[in-house]
Amino acid sequence: MRLDKYLKVSRLIKRRTVANEACGAGKITVNDKVARASYDVKVGDVIEITLGSKSVKVKVTEVKEVVRKEDAATMYEAAV
């Protein structure tokens, strides 16, 4: 699944266009490398999102095309 779509489906970022723009601006890294929106997300990837002064780092636990809002948080876990 594309990185921008994963971020939207997992509700880490609310809109896919915002995720796409953040990738283009270099604000999202996967496994410590700046990632493009077209990056293919895999289980085990560590995604770091830096927007403004906030930074979030998560580890991908599952990749699903469709997820209910209540279950979105099961797609990742906090990474240290």
Question: Where do the protein language model's features map onto the residues?
Answer:
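C-terminal structural segments of small proteins and small subunits
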Residues: 53-80
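Glycine-rich, charged/polar anion/phosphate-binding loops
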Residues: 46
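A basic, amphipathic helix-loop patch mediating RNA/tRNA/ribosome contacts
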Residues: 1-43
